[in-house]
Amino acid sequence: MLRVAVPNKGTLSEPATEILAEAGYRRRTDSKDLTVIDPVNQVEFFFLRPKDIAIYVGSGELDFGITGRDLVGDSDAPVRERLALGFGSSSFRYAGPAGRDWKIADLAGKRIATAYPNLVRKDLAERGIEATVIRLDGAVEISVQLGVADAIADVVGSGRTLSLHNLVAFGEPLCDSEAVLIESDRGGQDDTQAARDQLVARIQGVVFGQQYLMLDYDCPRAVLDKATAITPGLESPTIAPLADADWVAIRALVPRRGVNEIMDELAAIGAKAILASDIRFCRF
């Protein structure tokens, strides 16, 4: 039986649970449940703190886990990323008091508060910067105001929380994070390989369905080459003749992001009846 870790709370918890449910796995009925067994698919789910998941997976006790890329990087656990899941996006960045033109080099000799000390130490070492890293488990932004730190390194979404504490982000992100499916570097047992491959394929199919649309349209045969260049699909678009020999019907998968621009381009070359449809799953 596969053993899979899922975030028990926080912004990653609900989307992770939804993806697994869409992939055909049993969901927990009570938010207080710490384990759920899916006897049909031979999977046991463990609901754990997102920050601990990489450690459990890296130990080899669990086969897979869903957590943030930033948390994986900070854990130093022996795991590998199998899939990016397309939710929980954020940037991990340095920030300091507003009103100063901060540069990364300015961190030399400073005190940096963070909930991700390993990630920060690795970044500073790569840059050849010596600084004091102070570990805090929450409310990192207030540390500068309280005089505990000179700067911080933290997850940044909209930047609103930084602004509330008169802080400004600077430098390139240490890590662009999102939810990821991770697997132990220790490998799995041979008798679970089929189940492991199935779980990855199912989740990948759900994620793909969230990121792509099916586009159908009628196209003048005279501009067929231009149209297929705009919508090449994954392998190749489907092209079917219409009753009017001068026209063809085209179907292709296109990225959800940017679909309106694609439809604009098709309309500009004379395509008609352009229809975008949601897809739920896709297997490669």
From Swiss-Prot:
One of its GO terms (cellular component) is cytoplasm. Keywords: Amino-acid biosynthesis, ATP-binding, Cytoplasm, Glycosyltransferase, Histidine biosynthesis, Magnesium, Metal-binding, Nucleotide-binding, Transferase. It catalyses: 1-(5-phospho-beta-D-ribosyl)-ATP + diphosphate = 5-phospho-alpha-D-ribose 1-diphosphate + ATP. This is ATP phosphoribosyltransferase. It is an enzyme of class 2 (transferase). Belongs to the ATP phosphoribosyltransferase family. Long subfamily. It is found in: Cytoplasm. Equilibrium between an active dimeric form, an inactive hexameric form and higher aggregates. Interconversion between the various forms is largely reversible and is influenced by the natural substrates and inhibitors of the enzyme. Pathway: Amino-acid biosynthesis; L-histidine biosynthesis; L-histidine from 5-phospho-alpha-D-ribose 1-diphosphate: step 1/9. Its cofactor is Mg(2+). It comes from Mycolicibacterium paratuberculosis (strain ATCC BAA-968 / K-10) (Mycobacterium paratuberculosis). GO terms for biological process: L-histidine biosynthetic process. Pfam families: HisG, HisG_C. Its EC number is 2.4.2.17. Catalyzes the condensation of ATP and 5-phosphoribose 1-diphosphate to form N'-(5'-phosphoribosyl)-ATP (PR-ATP). Has a crucial role in the pathway because the rate of histidine biosynthesis seems to be controlled primarily by regulation of HisG enzymatic activity. Feedback inhibited by histidine.
